[in-house]
Curated annotation (Swiss-Prot):
Modified-residue entries (FMN phosphoryl threonine), positions: T187
ATP-binding is among the record's keywords: no
Location of this chain's protein in the cell: Cell inner membrane
Descriptive protein name: Ion-translocating oxidoreductase complex subunit D
Keyword Isomerase found: no
Taxonomy, superkingdom: Bacteria
Gene: rnfD
Native organism: Aliivibrio salmonicida (strain LFI1238)
UniProt main location, coarse: membrane
Keywords: Cell inner membrane, Cell membrane, Electron transport, Flavoprotein, FMN, Membrane, Phosphoprotein, Translocase, Transmembrane, Transmembrane helix, Transport
EC number(s) recorded for this UniProt protein: 7.-.-.-
Topology versus the membrane: Multi-pass membrane protein
Similarity field: Belongs to the NqrB/RnfD family.
BP-aspect Gene Ontology terms: electron transport chain; transmembrane transport
InterPro entries (UniProt xref): NqrB/RnfD, RnfD_bac
Length: 351
């Protein structure tokens, strides 16, 4: 009988990898539904396209590596990678953007390092950053929430915009939002960053229609949806509490300090917690067991570092949201964090 020799850690769990990946994917449903409700059918279309591309890319690499298809495709890791990347991409992005991103995530960020369990960086976020740097216009073309749209975008319009670049009536994404008051193609975080650079105060910026709520129209409920999904993951013990709690606590504390000393040029801690990809990042991205810290103390440092980096990038960086960059930078620090936080071997003195 042939036995497979695997490397450590030899962790044991009642839940298989297939089941865990499936449950994490299911936990995204509240956030996915909220994102679809406020930003249209494009979200679901991108998710479907990304999942199909991820499975095909996974099969392609497995064939090239002469690995059996069924065991690896059934673990649902490719499905989850495609899903998470699709949730971060603007809903009406061109189809080729999603295909390129997913292909990079699976082939380069995952399998180039050896496959599942060997990757140094979170594949979905590595792909997101590559897309953001390579195609900044397409990656920052977000529709405002549906309440602000003058023209209704139907399911078929979404299909045409994604695969043809124009709606059924021949309008581009920019043309469909030309009559929207305020900054139409930007997220609330982008609107804040642009407004502050123009010399406006935070209160003046938040008076724009896109801020019909303390975290931006639509984005509040999207983050609430991912928060609910994250609580489900904690309840099912699929993730450790250390990373999301330290991530959110760090972001809250730092943003609170700056809000106290400079209220006219900074946003509130609640705004930071419920804007952009905060909750998606805290519960679904940063908690990736492969690329995150492995000790409990290390997870606290790791999560706190991400929260700090998110605020720094949002406030002083070149991009409005910093979750992807923060996670990748923290991934680079994981070996150092694990080295200095590894527990003392039983029976040995510290030092």
């Amino acid at each position: 009988m042939a036995f497979f020799i695997t490397s450590s850690p030899h962790a044991h769990s009642k839940k298989s990898t297939q089941t865990m990946m499936k449950m994490v994917a299911l936990a995204t449903i509240p956030g996915l539904l909220a994102q679809t409700y406020f930003f249209g059918w494009g979200t679901l279309l991108q998710v479907l396209l990304a999942i199909i591309t991820a499975i095909l890319a996974e099969a392609f690499v497995l064939k090239c590596r002469k690995r059996p298809l069924a065991p690896y495709l059934k673990d649902n890791s490719a499905l989850l990678t495609g899903l998470l990347l699709a949730l971060a991409i603007p809903p009406l992005s061109p189809w080729w953007l999603t295909v390129i991103g997913v292909f990079f995530a699976i082939v380069i960020a995952k399998h180039l390092y050896g496959g599942l369990g060997q990757n140094l960086f979170n594949p979905a976020m590595a792909a997101y950053v590559v897309l953001l740097i390579s195609f900044p216009v397409q990656m920052t073309t977000w529709l405002p929430a549906k309440e602000l749209l003058v023209e209704h975008i139907s399911f078929m319009d979404s299909v045409w915009l994604i695969f043809h670049g124009l709606s059924q009536d021949g309008f581009s994404v920019h043309q469909l939002t030309m009559n929207v008051d305020g900054m139409t193609m930007a997220t609330p975080l982008d609107t804040v960053k642009t407004g502050l650079k123009a010399g406006l105060t935070t209160n003046e910026i938040l008076s724009a229609p896109i801020f019909n709520g303390f975290a931006g129209l639509g984005w509040l409920w999207v983050n609430v949806g991912f928060l609910l999904g994250g609580l489900f993951l904690l309840q099912q013990r699929l993730i450790h509490w250390h990373i999301p709690v330290s991530f959110l606590a760090s972001l809250f504390i730092v943003s609170s300090l700056f809000a106290v000393f400079s209220p006219d040029t900074t946003t509130s801690p609640i705004f930071n917690l419920f804007s952009g990809a905060t909750m998606l990042g805290a519960f679904f991205i940063a908690t990736d067991p492969v690329s995150a810290a492995t000790t409990n103390k290390g997870r606290l440092y790791y999560g706190a570092l991400i929260g700090l980096l998110v605020y720094m990038i949002r406030s002083w960086g070149g991009f409005p949201d910093g979750v992807a960059f923060a996670v990748l930078l923290a991934n680079m620090c994981v070996p150092l964090i694990d080295y200095y936080t590894k527990p003392r071997t039983y029976g040995h003195k510290k030092g």
